[in-house]
């Protein structure tokens, strides 16, 4: 009976949520209903695998935000593979630039409570605590940033404190506004809320801000930067154990799943790999 009551309560709550979002969409308060895939078995909108950025896309992204607030964040994602919470908690006392082989140590994590930043000295897993070598481009970027910084944080807000959730969203908006993704805004006209659509054209300047050029014809997420880093490690033939360590994966299964998708997602490479394996097999049988 208790179990039946719990199931009934879950269904009631689920239906309540679906009704709220359905009404919000019908009232044109939101554009998409995130609960349409919500079922009694759980789950939500099916997640699509985000592809790693190509070298060209990474270069275009960095060129588009050169000198802007998200630049250092993006560099740390692309060339150190840090998670968002690791980047926003990173302090200069964990970045070692004056050594023969510059590196950084991941020892803190960021999250927010009621939009206020909280920096934790305890990481979720032991694997998250790691030392990451810095490629020359990232080391140079951090040296320049540190020389002009008055904060103990590598990616701080204007006051030198860690970012709140809202401040991070604002930081990321510098990237979103430079994409050609279709976007919407609302205005009240004759007392009515009217939806307007903006369709950016690649290479053109934004009508509202001449400093903004629509230079990105692809979307980017913070996690995609990290995925690009891991993908590049694998394409550079870094062994799975080292990839696991640098990525901070607690489970080797996570690393191997990514490794398999990346390594064998190219038919030509798979054919060569299998051909080599069968050649060795034939030689052993001869």
Outline where the language-model segments fall.
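Conserved hydrophobic/aromatic pocket- or pore-lining residues that grip, position, or stack substrates
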Residues: 17-20, 38, 61, 76, ...
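Single conserved hydrophobic/aromatic residue that forms the stacking wall/gate
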Residues: 1-8, 13
């Amino acid at each position: 009976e208790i179990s039946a009551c719990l199931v009934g309560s879950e269904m009631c709550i689920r239906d309540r949520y679906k009704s709220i979002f359905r009404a919000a969409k019908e009232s044109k308060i939101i554009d998409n209903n995130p609960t349409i895939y919500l079922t009694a078995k759980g789950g939500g909108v099916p997640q699509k695998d985000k592809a790693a950025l190509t070298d060209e896309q990474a270069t275009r992204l960095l060129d588009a935000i050169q000198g802007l607030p998200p630049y250092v964040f993006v560099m740390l994602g692309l060339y150190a593979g840090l998670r968002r919470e690791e980047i926003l908690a990173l302090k200069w006392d964990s970045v070692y630039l004056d050594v023969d082989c510059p590196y950084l140590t991941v020892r803190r994590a960021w999250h927010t409570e009621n939009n206020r930043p909280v920096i934790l000295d305890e990481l979720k897993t032991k694997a998250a605590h790691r030392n990451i070598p810095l490629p020359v481009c990232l080391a140079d970027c951090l040296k320049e940033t540190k020389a002009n910084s008055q904060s103990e944080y590598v990616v701080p807000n204007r006051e030198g404190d860690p970012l709140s959730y809202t401040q991070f969203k604002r930081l990321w908006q510098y990237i979103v506004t430079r994409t050609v993704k279709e976007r919407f805004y609302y205005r009240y006209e004759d007392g009515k809320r009217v939806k307007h659509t903006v369709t950016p054209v690649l290479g053109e300047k934004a009508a509202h801000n001449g400093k903004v050029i629509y230079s990105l014809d692809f979307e980017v997420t913070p996690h995609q930067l990290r995925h690009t880093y891991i993908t590049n490690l694998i394409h550079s033939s870094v062994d799975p154990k080292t990839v696991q360590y640098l990525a901070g994966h607690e489970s080797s299964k996570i690393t191997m799943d990514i490794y398999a998708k990346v390594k064998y997602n190219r038919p030509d490479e798979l054919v060569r790999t299998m051909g080599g394996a069968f050649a060795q097999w034939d030689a052993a049988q001869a």
